[in-house]
From Swiss-Prot:
The gene is recR. This is Recombination protein RecR. It comes from Thiobacillus denitrificans (strain ATCC 25259 / T1). The lineage of its organism: Bacteria, Pseudomonadati, Pseudomonadota, Betaproteobacteria, Nitrosomonadales. GO terms for biological process: DNA recombination; DNA repair. NCBIfam families: recR. InterPro entries: DNA_Rcmb_RecR, Rcmb_RecR, Rcmb_RecR_Znf, TOPRIM_dom, TOPRIM_RecR. HAMAP family: RecR.
Length: 197
């Protein structure tokens, strides 16, 4: 039988995605046996984040201010609005340094089987943001999973019906990729989405 505090820590670690009971136990043992200072740092950082982070009122990404740095920047192209599923997708788009518009972070994707509908992905806020009078194009940058595709389709239809230009990220062969190593579905999509030179 384990001490209640240890059991509580293991159960708390299980809330993380992809962490089952064995992984949670290994993490707990590591933090308690080998890295107590790291455990204190982790606890402090988590407490700080919970206290100081909230959602940007414009893009819904995490921010310490009411409006995040990207939304507040005067150097961004306010005519473009990229819709991404999660903050990690926002960060990936920023890392490319190829997009200079604004964002809206859904904090998920439509998944009726999991009980995630339009309200859970803040669709009403997205529509209001897209119709603010400055946005000319909405770029749907959701993932190419069945749920991401359904989310993009739903959002695209709603926004096109309101007169907005809507585009979707292209997909296909990765940069530097060799055709013999690309799966047939990706290659087929690349052929369908080809463009003239």
């Amino acid at each position: 039988m384990q001490p209640a505090a240890l059991e509580s820590l293991i159960n708390a670690l299980r809330v993380l995605p992809g962490v089952g009971p064995k992984s949670a136990a290994r993490m707990a043992y590591h933090l308690l046996q080998r890295d107590r200072r790291g455990a204190e740092t982790l606890a402090g950082a988590l407490g700080h984040a919970l206290t100081h982070l909230h959602h940007c009122r414009l893009c819904n990404n995490f921010s310490e201010a009411e409006v995040c740095e990207v939304c507040a920047s005067t150097r961004r192209d306010r005519r473009q609005l990229a819709v991404v599923e999660m903050p990690a997708d926002f960060n990936m788009m920023e890392a490319t340094q190829s997009y200079n518009g604004l964002y809206f972070v859904l904090m998920g994707r439509l998944s009726p089987l999991d009980g995630i509908g339009p309200r859970e992905i803040h669709l009403d806020r997205l529509i209001n943001r897209a119709l603010d009078g400055t946005v000319e194009e909405v770029i749907l940058a959701t993932n190419f999973t069945p749920e991401g595709e359904a989310t993009a389709h739903t959002i695209g239809e709603l926004l096109k019906a309101r007169g907005l230009k809507v585009s979707r990220l292209a997909r296909g062969v990765p940069v530097g990729g060799e055709l013999e190593y690309v799966d047939s579905g990706t290659l087929a999509q690349a052929v369908r989405d080809r463009r003239a030179l």
